[in-house]
Amino acid sequence: MSNKEIEDNEDVWKERCMNCIRCNDEKNCGTCWPCRNGKTCDMRKCFSAKRLYNEKVKRQTDENLKAIMAKTAQREAAHQAATTTAPSAPVVIEQQVEKKKRGRKKGSGNGGAAAAAQQRKANIINERDYVPNRPTRQQSADLRRKRTQLNAEPDKHPRQCLNPNCIYESRIDSKYCSDECGKELARMRLTEILPNRCKQYFFEGPSGGPRSLEDEIKPKRAKINREVQKLTESEKNMMAFLNKLVEFIKTQLKLQPLGTEERYDDNLYEGCIVCGLPDIPLLKYTKHIELCWARSEKAISFGAPEKNNDMFYCEKYDSRTNSFCKRLKSLCPEHRKLGDEQHLKVCGYPKKWEDGMIETAKTVSELIEMEDPFGEEGCRTKKDACHKHHKWIPSLRGTIELEQACLFQKMYELCHEMHKLNAHAEWTTNALSIMMHKQPNIIDSEQMSLFNKSQSTSSSASAHGATTPISSTSSSSSSSSKNDDEMEDTAEFLANLAVQKEEETQNN
Protein backbone atom coordinates (compact mmCIF):
# COMPACT_ATOMS: atom_id res chain seq x y z
CA MET A 1 0.00 0.00 0.00
CA SER A 2 1.18 3.51 -0.80
CA ASN A 3 1.45 6.25 1.80
CA LYS A 4 -1.73 7.92 0.55
CA GLU A 5 -3.68 4.66 0.78
CA ILE A 6 -2.39 4.11 4.32
CA GLU A 7 -3.39 7.63 5.35
CA ASP A 8 -6.90 7.18 3.91
CA ASN A 9 -7.38 3.70 5.37
CA GLU A 10 -9.41 3.99 8.56
CA ASP A 11 -8.56 0.41 9.60
CA VAL A 12 -4.98 1.57 10.20
CA TRP A 13 -5.95 4.33 12.65
CA LYS A 14 -8.27 2.07 14.64
CA GLU A 15 -5.18 0.44 16.18
CA ARG A 16 -4.18 1.88 19.57
CA CYS A 17 -1.12 1.37 21.78
CA MET A 18 -2.66 3.28 24.76
CA ASN A 19 0.79 4.56 25.77
CA CYS A 20 1.27 7.71 23.69
CA ILE A 21 -0.41 11.07 24.27
CA ARG A 22 -2.59 10.74 21.19
CA CYS A 23 -4.19 7.54 22.48
CA ASN A 24 -5.05 9.28 25.75
CA ASP A 25 -6.62 12.27 24.02
CA GLU A 26 -10.40 11.86 24.09
CA LYS A 27 -11.48 15.00 22.20
CA ASN A 28 -11.17 15.92 18.53
CA CYS A 29 -9.65 19.22 17.50
CA GLY A 30 -12.52 19.96 15.08
CA THR A 31 -10.31 21.97 12.74
CA CYS A 32 -8.38 19.39 10.70
CA TRP A 33 -9.59 17.88 7.42
CA PRO A 34 -10.35 14.36 8.83
CA CYS A 35 -12.52 15.87 11.57
CA ARG A 36 -14.57 17.77 9.02
CA ASN A 37 -15.05 14.60 6.95
CA GLY A 38 -16.03 12.32 9.82
CA LYS A 39 -12.72 10.43 10.03
CA THR A 40 -10.12 9.98 12.77
CA CYS A 41 -8.68 13.27 13.99
CA ASP A 42 -5.02 13.96 13.23
CA MET A 43 -4.41 14.74 16.90
CA ARG A 44 -5.79 11.32 17.92
CA LYS A 45 -3.92 9.13 15.42
CA CYS A 46 -1.65 6.79 17.35
CA PHE A 47 2.08 7.03 16.66
CA SER A 48 2.34 3.21 16.56
CA ALA A 49 -0.81 2.60 14.49
CA LYS A 50 1.04 1.64 11.30
CA ARG A 51 3.30 -0.81 13.11
CA LEU A 52 0.37 -2.39 14.96
CA TYR A 53 -1.63 -2.66 11.72
CA ASN A 54 1.26 -4.36 9.94
CA GLU A 55 1.62 -6.83 12.83
CA LYS A 56 -2.11 -7.56 12.69
CA VAL A 57 -1.98 -8.20 8.93
CA LYS A 58 1.04 -10.45 9.38
CA ARG A 59 -0.73 -12.37 12.15
CA GLN A 60 -3.79 -12.87 9.96
CA THR A 61 -1.58 -14.04 7.11
CA ASP A 62 0.09 -16.59 9.37
CA GLU A 63 -3.30 -17.89 10.50
CA ASN A 64 -4.37 -18.19 6.88
CA LEU A 65 -1.21 -20.11 6.07
CA LYS A 66 -1.91 -22.49 8.93
CA ALA A 67 -5.44 -23.01 7.57
CA ILE A 68 -3.99 -23.80 4.16
CA MET A 69 -1.58 -26.30 5.71
CA ALA A 70 -4.45 -27.99 7.59
CA LYS A 71 -6.59 -28.24 4.45
CA THR A 72 -3.65 -29.55 2.43
CA ALA A 73 -2.84 -32.14 5.09
CA GLN A 74 -6.47 -33.32 5.13
CA ARG A 75 -6.50 -33.61 1.35
CA GLU A 76 -3.22 -35.55 1.32
CA ALA A 77 -4.46 -37.87 4.09
CA ALA A 78 -7.69 -38.57 2.20
CA HIS A 79 -5.76 -39.21 -1.01
CA GLN A 80 -3.34 -41.55 0.78
CA ALA A 81 -6.22 -43.47 2.40
CA ALA A 82 -7.93 -43.86 -0.97
CA THR A 83 -4.75 -45.18 -2.59
CA THR A 84 -4.11 -47.69 0.21
CA THR A 85 -7.67 -49.11 0.11
CA ALA A 86 -7.71 -49.41 -3.72
CA PRO A 87 -6.82 -52.89 -5.23
CA SER A 88 -3.25 -53.43 -6.34
CA ALA A 89 -4.15 -54.61 -9.84
CA PRO A 90 -6.94 -52.97 -11.82
CA VAL A 91 -9.83 -55.27 -12.70
CA VAL A 92 -10.92 -54.96 -16.31
CA ILE A 93 -14.69 -55.18 -16.65
CA GLU A 94 -15.98 -55.63 -20.09
CA GLN A 95 -18.97 -53.52 -20.73
CA GLN A 96 -20.99 -53.24 -23.79
CA VAL A 97 -20.00 -50.05 -25.45
CA GLU A 98 -22.99 -48.35 -26.79
CA LYS A 99 -22.72 -46.49 -30.00
CA LYS A 100 -22.83 -42.76 -29.51
CA LYS A 101 -25.70 -40.95 -31.06
CA ARG A 102 -26.08 -37.40 -32.16
CA GLY A 103 -28.04 -34.88 -30.16
CA ARG A 104 -28.96 -34.71 -26.53
CA LYS A 105 -30.38 -37.52 -24.50
CA LYS A 106 -33.97 -37.41 -23.54
CA GLY A 107 -34.62 -35.80 -20.21
CA SER A 108 -31.19 -34.18 -20.06
CA GLY A 109 -30.95 -30.44 -20.21
CA ASN A 110 -28.91 -27.64 -18.69
CA GLY A 111 -29.70 -28.95 -15.23
CA GLY A 112 -27.47 -31.98 -15.58
CA ALA A 113 -24.51 -29.94 -16.77
CA ALA A 114 -25.02 -27.44 -13.96
CA ALA A 115 -25.16 -30.24 -11.38
CA ALA A 116 -21.95 -31.75 -12.75
CA ALA A 117 -20.24 -28.37 -12.60
CA GLN A 118 -21.33 -27.88 -8.99
CA GLN A 119 -20.04 -31.34 -8.12
CA ARG A 120 -16.66 -30.51 -9.65
CA LYS A 121 -16.51 -27.24 -7.70
CA ALA A 122 -17.37 -29.06 -4.49
CA ASN A 123 -14.54 -31.52 -5.01
CA ILE A 124 -12.02 -28.72 -5.52
CA ILE A 125 -10.79 -26.95 -2.37
CA ASN A 126 -11.47 -23.27 -2.88
CA GLU A 127 -8.95 -21.44 -0.70
CA ARG A 128 -10.51 -18.05 -1.40
CA ASP A 129 -13.57 -19.04 0.64
CA TYR A 130 -11.63 -19.06 3.90
CA VAL A 131 -8.37 -17.23 3.09
CA PRO A 132 -8.77 -13.43 2.75
CA ASN A 133 -5.11 -12.92 1.78
CA ARG A 134 -3.60 -15.58 -0.43
CA PRO A 135 0.05 -16.45 0.31
CA THR A 136 2.83 -15.47 -2.01
CA ARG A 137 5.00 -17.94 -3.87
CA GLN A 138 7.79 -17.56 -1.35
CA GLN A 139 5.44 -18.25 1.57
CA SER A 140 4.05 -21.34 -0.16
CA ALA A 141 7.59 -22.59 -0.80
CA ASP A 142 8.49 -22.05 2.86
CA LEU A 143 5.42 -24.01 3.89
CA ARG A 144 6.36 -26.92 1.64
CA ARG A 145 9.92 -26.88 2.98
CA LYS A 146 8.72 -26.90 6.60
CA ARG A 147 6.27 -29.71 5.86
CA THR A 148 9.03 -31.82 4.31
CA GLN A 149 11.28 -31.14 7.30
CA LEU A 150 8.57 -32.23 9.73
CA ASN A 151 7.80 -35.36 7.73
CA ALA A 152 11.46 -36.20 7.16
CA GLU A 153 12.61 -39.59 8.27
CA PRO A 154 15.08 -39.85 11.18
CA ASP A 155 18.72 -40.67 10.63
CA LYS A 156 19.23 -44.19 9.35
CA HIS A 157 22.63 -44.43 11.08
CA PRO A 158 22.19 -44.74 14.86
CA ARG A 159 24.28 -42.57 17.15
CA GLN A 160 26.02 -43.77 20.26
CA CYS A 161 25.12 -42.46 23.70
CA LEU A 162 27.40 -39.61 24.79
CA ASN A 163 27.97 -41.11 28.23
CA PRO A 164 31.56 -42.52 28.23
CA ASN A 165 30.48 -45.52 30.35
CA CYS A 166 27.61 -46.44 28.02
CA ILE A 167 27.88 -48.66 24.94
CA TYR A 168 24.25 -48.39 23.75
CA GLU A 169 22.84 -46.24 20.98
CA SER A 170 20.98 -43.05 21.77
CA ARG A 171 17.26 -42.58 21.54
CA ILE A 172 15.56 -40.87 18.60
CA ASP A 173 16.04 -37.08 18.71
CA SER A 174 18.26 -37.42 21.79
CA LYS A 175 21.95 -37.66 22.65
CA TYR A 176 21.55 -40.27 25.37
CA CYS A 177 20.03 -43.72 25.63
CA SER A 178 18.23 -42.86 28.88
CA ASP A 179 17.76 -40.03 31.37
CA GLU A 180 20.19 -41.68 33.79
CA CYS A 181 23.04 -41.41 31.28
CA GLY A 182 22.40 -37.70 30.78
CA LYS A 183 22.30 -37.08 34.52
CA GLU A 184 25.49 -39.08 35.03
CA LEU A 185 27.37 -37.08 32.39
CA ALA A 186 26.11 -33.81 33.88
CA ARG A 187 27.31 -34.98 37.30
CA MET A 188 30.73 -35.76 35.79
CA ARG A 189 30.97 -32.25 34.41
CA LEU A 190 30.16 -30.72 37.79
CA THR A 191 32.51 -32.95 39.79
CA GLU A 192 35.45 -33.29 37.41
CA ILE A 193 35.48 -30.62 34.69
CA LEU A 194 34.16 -27.65 36.68
CA PRO A 195 36.82 -27.80 39.46
CA ASN A 196 39.57 -28.04 36.85
CA ARG A 197 38.15 -25.09 34.95
CA CYS A 198 37.87 -23.08 38.18
CA LYS A 199 41.51 -23.81 39.07
CA GLN A 200 42.61 -22.73 35.62
CA TYR A 201 40.49 -19.58 35.73
CA PHE A 202 41.33 -18.49 39.29
CA PHE A 203 45.03 -19.17 38.79
CA GLU A 204 47.16 -16.79 40.89
CA GLY A 205 49.32 -15.13 38.33
CA PRO A 206 49.35 -12.51 35.59
CA SER A 207 47.31 -14.77 33.33
CA GLY A 208 44.60 -15.58 35.86
CA GLY A 209 41.01 -14.92 34.89
CA PRO A 210 40.11 -12.45 37.66
CA ARG A 211 43.44 -10.63 37.25
CA SER A 212 42.99 -10.25 33.48
CA LEU A 213 39.34 -9.27 33.92
CA GLU A 214 40.30 -6.65 36.48
CA ASP A 215 42.99 -5.27 34.19
CA GLU A 216 40.42 -5.04 31.42
CA ILE A 217 37.59 -3.42 33.38
CA LYS A 218 39.57 -1.18 35.74
CA PRO A 219 40.56 1.49 33.14
CA LYS A 220 37.01 1.58 31.80
CA ARG A 221 35.60 2.15 35.28
CA ALA A 222 38.16 4.85 35.97
CA LYS A 223 37.23 6.60 32.71
CA ILE A 224 33.53 6.48 33.56
CA ASN A 225 34.19 7.84 37.06
CA ARG A 226 36.18 10.72 35.60
CA GLU A 227 33.36 11.53 33.20
CA VAL A 228 30.80 11.42 36.02
CA GLN A 229 32.92 13.72 38.16
CA LYS A 230 33.31 16.13 35.25
CA LEU A 231 29.56 16.20 34.63
CA THR A 232 28.91 16.76 38.34
CA GLU A 233 31.23 19.77 38.36
CA SER A 234 29.50 21.14 35.26
CA GLU A 235 26.13 20.80 36.98
CA LYS A 236 27.43 22.68 40.03
CA ASN A 237 28.78 25.45 37.79
CA MET A 238 25.40 25.79 36.07
CA MET A 239 23.55 26.08 39.38
CA ALA A 240 26.08 28.69 40.55
CA PHE A 241 25.60 30.58 37.26
CA LEU A 242 21.82 30.68 37.79
CA ASN A 243 22.34 31.98 41.33
CA LYS A 244 24.62 34.72 39.97
CA LEU A 245 21.91 35.61 37.44
CA VAL A 246 19.36 35.97 40.25
CA GLU A 247 21.73 38.23 42.21
CA PHE A 248 22.37 40.36 39.12
CA ILE A 249 18.62 40.77 38.53
CA LYS A 250 18.14 41.88 42.15
CA THR A 251 20.75 44.62 41.67
CA GLN A 252 18.85 45.88 38.60
CA LEU A 253 15.48 46.08 40.35
CA LYS A 254 16.30 49.41 42.03
CA LEU A 255 17.41 51.16 38.84
CA GLN A 256 15.31 53.59 36.83
CA PRO A 257 15.33 53.86 33.02
CA LEU A 258 17.53 56.54 31.45
CA GLY A 259 17.67 58.12 28.00
CA THR A 260 15.12 58.24 25.23
CA GLU A 261 13.37 55.29 23.70
CA GLU A 262 14.95 53.77 20.61
CA ARG A 263 12.87 54.19 17.51
CA TYR A 264 13.38 52.83 14.03
CA ASP A 265 12.36 54.31 10.74
CA ASP A 266 8.70 53.58 10.03
CA ASN A 267 9.52 52.85 6.40
CA LEU A 268 11.50 49.69 7.27
CA TYR A 269 9.56 46.42 6.96
CA GLU A 270 10.55 42.81 7.31
CA GLY A 271 8.89 39.45 6.61
CA CYS A 272 8.06 36.98 9.37
CA ILE A 273 9.98 33.72 9.11
CA VAL A 274 7.31 31.84 11.11
CA CYS A 275 3.96 32.81 9.63
CA GLY A 276 5.26 34.29 6.35
CA LEU A 277 3.59 37.69 6.74
CA PRO A 278 5.55 40.02 4.41
CA ASP A 279 5.01 43.54 5.81
CA ILE A 280 5.87 43.86 9.49
CA PRO A 281 7.26 47.14 10.87
CA LEU A 282 10.74 46.72 12.24
CA LEU A 283 9.59 48.33 15.48
CA LYS A 284 7.22 45.40 16.19
CA TYR A 285 9.23 42.65 14.54
CA THR A 286 10.64 40.97 17.67
CA LYS A 287 7.30 40.90 19.47
CA HIS A 288 5.58 39.55 16.37
CA ILE A 289 8.16 36.76 16.05
CA GLU A 290 7.64 35.83 19.70
CA LEU A 291 3.85 35.69 19.36
CA CYS A 292 4.06 33.60 16.18
CA TRP A 293 6.46 31.17 17.82
CA ALA A 294 4.26 30.86 20.93
CA ARG A 295 1.19 30.24 18.76
CA SER A 296 2.93 27.50 16.76
CA GLU A 297 4.27 25.89 19.96
CA LYS A 298 0.81 25.78 21.52
CA ALA A 299 -0.53 23.96 18.48
CA ILE A 300 1.94 21.11 19.04
CA SER A 301 1.64 18.80 22.03
CA PHE A 302 4.87 17.98 23.90
CA GLY A 303 3.84 15.59 26.65
CA ALA A 304 4.35 12.19 28.23
CA PRO A 305 2.22 10.12 30.62
CA GLU A 306 5.01 9.90 33.23
CA LYS A 307 6.32 12.73 35.38
CA ASN A 308 10.06 13.23 35.89
CA ASN A 309 11.68 14.79 38.92
CA ASP A 310 13.98 16.96 36.82
CA MET A 311 14.11 20.68 37.46
CA PHE A 312 14.45 21.82 33.85
CA TYR A 313 11.15 20.56 32.36
CA CYS A 314 7.75 22.20 32.78
CA GLU A 315 5.93 19.08 34.11
CA LYS A 316 2.53 20.82 34.10
CA TYR A 317 -0.33 18.31 34.03
CA ASP A 318 -2.83 18.60 31.17
CA SER A 319 -6.16 16.97 32.00
CA ARG A 320 -7.30 17.06 28.37
CA THR A 321 -4.49 14.80 27.13
CA ASN A 322 -3.68 13.13 30.50
CA SER A 323 0.00 13.98 30.08
CA PHE A 324 2.75 16.14 31.58
CA CYS A 325 4.28 18.98 29.56
CA LYS A 326 7.87 18.25 28.50
CA ARG A 327 8.91 21.69 27.26
CA LEU A 328 11.74 23.59 28.89
CA LYS A 329 10.50 25.40 31.96
CA SER A 330 11.68 28.88 30.96
CA LEU A 331 10.53 28.63 27.32
CA CYS A 332 7.10 27.02 27.72
CA PRO A 333 4.59 29.48 26.16
CA GLU A 334 1.60 27.98 28.04
CA HIS A 335 2.78 27.42 31.61
CA ARG A 336 5.84 29.67 32.05
CA LYS A 337 5.91 31.51 35.35
CA LEU A 338 7.63 34.88 35.51
CA GLY A 339 10.28 35.34 38.18
CA ASP A 340 11.88 38.46 39.56
CA GLU A 341 12.38 39.83 36.05
CA GLN A 342 8.71 40.83 35.86
CA HIS A 343 9.40 43.63 38.36
CA LEU A 344 12.26 45.07 36.33
CA LYS A 345 11.82 48.59 34.98
CA VAL A 346 14.97 48.54 32.87
CA CYS A 347 16.20 46.04 30.29
CA GLY A 348 19.15 44.92 32.45
CA TYR A 349 21.18 43.36 29.66
CA PRO A 350 24.83 43.27 30.89
CA LYS A 351 26.99 46.02 29.44
CA LYS A 352 29.91 43.63 29.73
CA TRP A 353 28.44 41.48 26.98
CA GLU A 354 27.48 44.38 24.76
CA ASP A 355 30.90 46.06 24.89
CA GLY A 356 32.73 42.86 23.95
CA MET A 357 34.58 42.54 27.24
CA ILE A 358 34.10 38.75 27.39
CA GLU A 359 36.08 37.83 24.31
CA THR A 360 37.50 34.79 26.11
CA ALA A 361 34.04 33.23 26.52
CA LYS A 362 33.07 32.03 23.06
CA THR A 363 30.65 29.30 24.19
CA VAL A 364 28.02 28.92 26.88
CA SER A 365 30.17 26.51 28.89
CA GLU A 366 33.02 29.03 28.97
CA LEU A 367 30.62 31.77 30.05
CA ILE A 368 29.31 29.58 32.87
CA GLU A 369 32.80 28.90 34.20
CA MET A 370 33.66 32.62 34.49
CA GLU A 371 33.84 34.10 37.99
CA ASP A 372 32.05 37.36 37.09
CA PRO A 373 29.99 36.70 33.96
CA PHE A 374 27.58 39.69 34.24
CA GLY A 375 29.57 42.60 35.58
CA GLU A 376 27.97 45.45 37.50
CA GLU A 377 26.15 47.58 34.92
CA GLY A 378 23.26 46.72 32.63
CA CYS A 379 21.21 48.28 29.87
CA ARG A 380 19.24 51.24 31.32
CA THR A 381 16.69 51.41 28.54
CA LYS A 382 13.06 50.90 29.47
CA LYS A 383 12.24 47.20 29.41
CA ASP A 384 9.25 47.43 27.05
CA ALA A 385 11.03 49.85 24.72
CA CYS A 386 14.34 47.98 24.30
CA HIS A 387 14.32 46.18 20.96
CA LYS A 388 17.92 44.95 21.04
CA HIS A 389 17.64 42.66 24.06
CA HIS A 390 14.06 41.46 23.94
CA LYS A 391 13.46 38.91 26.75
CA TRP A 392 17.10 37.97 27.13
CA ILE A 393 16.57 36.47 30.61
CA PRO A 394 14.15 33.65 29.57
CA SER A 395 16.36 32.91 26.56
CA LEU A 396 19.46 32.60 28.77
CA ARG A 397 17.66 30.39 31.28
CA GLY A 398 16.33 28.21 28.47
CA THR A 399 19.87 27.76 27.16
CA ILE A 400 21.07 26.68 30.61
CA GLU A 401 18.15 24.26 30.98
CA LEU A 402 18.98 22.74 27.60
CA GLU A 403 22.57 22.22 28.76
CA GLN A 404 21.25 20.58 31.93
CA ALA A 405 19.09 18.22 29.86
CA CYS A 406 22.13 17.22 27.79
CA LEU A 407 24.12 16.61 30.98
CA PHE A 408 21.33 14.45 32.35
CA GLN A 409 21.30 12.35 29.17
CA LYS A 410 25.08 11.88 29.30
CA MET A 411 24.87 10.88 32.97
CA TYR A 412 22.21 8.30 32.14
CA GLU A 413 24.40 6.82 29.39
CA LEU A 414 27.38 6.60 31.74
CA CYS A 415 25.30 4.85 34.42
CA HIS A 416 24.04 2.39 31.82
CA GLU A 417 27.61 1.68 30.69
CA MET A 418 28.73 1.13 34.30
CA HIS A 419 25.83 -1.28 34.81
CA LYS A 420 26.91 -3.24 31.73
CA LEU A 421 30.49 -3.50 33.06
CA ASN A 422 29.28 -4.75 36.45
CA ALA A 423 26.98 -7.29 34.80
CA HIS A 424 29.85 -8.48 32.60
CA ALA A 425 32.12 -8.90 35.64
CA GLU A 426 29.45 -10.85 37.54
CA TRP A 427 28.69 -13.11 34.58
CA THR A 428 32.34 -13.84 33.81
CA THR A 429 32.99 -15.20 37.30
CA ASN A 430 29.82 -17.28 37.28
CA ALA A 431 30.08 -21.09 37.35
CA LEU A 432 27.90 -21.45 34.27
CA SER A 433 30.10 -19.04 32.33
CA ILE A 434 33.25 -20.89 33.38
CA MET A 435 31.70 -24.16 32.20
CA MET A 436 30.60 -22.71 28.85
CA HIS A 437 33.72 -20.73 27.94
CA LYS A 438 37.19 -22.05 27.29
CA GLN A 439 40.21 -21.53 29.48
CA PRO A 440 42.25 -18.31 29.01
CA ASN A 441 44.96 -18.38 26.38
CA ILE A 442 48.54 -18.42 27.77
CA ILE A 443 51.14 -17.12 25.33
CA ASP A 444 54.19 -16.31 27.46
CA SER A 445 56.56 -19.27 28.02
CA GLU A 446 57.18 -18.38 31.67
CA GLN A 447 53.48 -18.19 32.33
CA MET A 448 53.04 -21.51 30.53
CA SER A 449 55.66 -23.23 32.69
CA LEU A 450 54.14 -21.86 35.89
CA PHE A 451 50.73 -22.98 34.76
CA ASN A 452 51.93 -26.52 33.93
CA LYS A 453 53.74 -26.76 37.25
CA SER A 454 50.63 -25.75 39.19
CA GLN A 455 48.55 -28.20 37.17
CA SER A 456 50.95 -31.07 37.89
CA THR A 457 50.97 -30.35 41.63
CA SER A 458 47.20 -30.04 41.77
CA SER A 459 46.71 -33.26 39.78
CA SER A 460 49.14 -35.22 42.00
CA ALA A 461 47.41 -33.93 45.13
CA SER A 462 43.98 -34.85 43.82
CA ALA A 463 45.09 -38.28 42.52
CA HIS A 464 44.49 -39.95 45.91
CA GLY A 465 40.85 -38.87 46.02
CA ALA A 466 40.07 -39.47 42.37
CA THR A 467 37.33 -41.85 41.34
CA THR A 468 37.92 -45.11 39.47
CA PRO A 469 38.83 -44.35 35.84
CA ILE A 470 36.65 -45.55 33.04
CA SER A 471 37.71 -48.68 31.17
CA SER A 472 39.60 -48.30 27.95
CA THR A 473 37.12 -50.47 26.05
CA SER A 474 34.18 -48.23 26.90
CA SER A 475 36.18 -45.06 26.11
CA SER A 476 37.34 -46.48 22.80
CA SER A 477 33.81 -47.52 21.88
CA SER A 478 32.46 -44.04 22.72
CA SER A 479 35.07 -42.16 20.68
CA SER A 480 33.05 -42.39 17.47
CA SER A 481 30.69 -39.61 16.32
CA LYS A 482 31.70 -37.11 19.09
CA ASN A 483 31.83 -33.76 17.34
CA ASP A 484 29.72 -31.41 19.45
CA ASP A 485 30.77 -29.21 22.37
CA GLU A 486 29.81 -31.75 25.00
CA MET A 487 32.07 -34.34 23.43
CA GLU A 488 34.97 -31.88 23.50
CA ASP A 489 34.48 -31.49 27.26
CA THR A 490 34.29 -35.28 27.64
CA ALA A 491 37.50 -35.77 25.65
CA GLU A 492 39.27 -33.19 27.81
CA PHE A 493 38.02 -34.98 30.91
CA LEU A 494 39.32 -38.36 29.67
CA ALA A 495 42.69 -36.83 28.77
CA ASN A 496 43.05 -35.41 32.30
CA LEU A 497 42.25 -38.83 33.77
CA ALA A 498 44.88 -40.46 31.54
CA VAL A 499 47.51 -37.92 32.70
CA GLN A 500 46.62 -38.62 36.32
CA LYS A 501 46.95 -42.37 35.78
CA GLU A 502 50.40 -42.00 34.18
CA GLU A 503 51.60 -39.84 37.07
CA GLU A 504 50.36 -42.44 39.56
CA THR A 505 52.31 -45.19 37.79
CA GLN A 506 55.47 -43.03 37.73
CA ASN A 507 55.18 -42.23 41.43
CA ASN A 508 54.76 -45.91 42.30
UniProtKB/Swiss-Prot annotation:
Function (record text): Transcriptional activator that exhibits a unique DNA binding specificity for CpG motifs; enriched at promoters containing the trimethylation mark on histone H3 'Lys-4' (H3K4me3). Forms part of the SET2 complex and interacts with the SIN3S HDAC complex at promoters. Required for H3K4 trimethylation and plays a repressive role in the expression of heat shock and salt-inducible genes. Required for fertility, in cooperation with class I histone deacetylases (HDACs).
GO molecular function: DNA binding; methylated histone binding; zinc ion binding
Annotated GO biological process: positive regulation of DNA-templated transcription; transdifferentiation
Zinc fingers (CXXC-type), renumbered ranges: 10-47
Subunit structure: Component of the SET2 complex (also known as the SET1/COMPASS complex), which contains at least set-2, swd-2.1, cfp-1, rbbp-5, wdr-5.1, dpy-30 and ash-2. Within the complex, interacts with wdr-5.1, ash-2 and dpy-30. Also interacts with the SIN3S complex, which contains at least sin-3, hda-1, athp-1 and mrg-1. Interacts with sin-3, hda-1 and mrg-1.
UniProt KW keywords: DNA-binding, Metal-binding, Nucleus, Transcription, Transcription regulation, Zinc, Zinc-finger
Biased composition (Low complexity): 113-123, 454-481
Protein name: CXXC-type zinc finger protein 1
Protein localization: Nucleus
InterPro entries given in the database record: CpG-bd_C, Spp1/CFP1
Transcription regulation listed as a keyword: yes
This protein's GO CC annotations: Set1C/COMPASS complex
Location of the region described as Disordered in the Swiss-Prot/TrEMBL record: 95-156, 453-508
